[in-house]
Amino acid sequence: MEINKLNSLVELYFKKCDEVDKKKPFLEWLKPGKPTYNWGDVRERIFKLSSKIKTLINEGDRCLILSENRPYWLIADIAVMNAGGISVPIFTTYAESDYNYILNDCDPEIIIVSNNDQFKKINHLPFFDVTS
């Protein structure tokens, strides 16, 4: 693989995906008992999410990702970029004022959260006030 001929992380990922056995493990949870995802599973999930994201954004729109370190984070990150969006990942440990600043500064077209606990951290912030 000639990395210097690739233009993005998305191209690098899909090139690597084409080169490896699709059944080879790729992502797994740190918690016991959670599933492991192979290269084929991840590729399919990226394409499905990317297709949905493409219906919600225009090329170059920012897409915020609020998630813990988990397999779905990488899937969301690559899906956003594959859809033409700009991925804006944020930590789950920020203070409310940090979330408020980032939301207003980046003005995301969509926000992807990993679970309801993460959504609760931001859904009450002024950014979501449709009357302003």
Tell where the protein language model's regions lie, with residue ranges.
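Anion (oxyanion) recognition and catalysis
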Residues: 81
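Conserved ATP-dependent adenylate/AMP-binding module captured primarily in the ANL superfamily
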Residues: 92-123
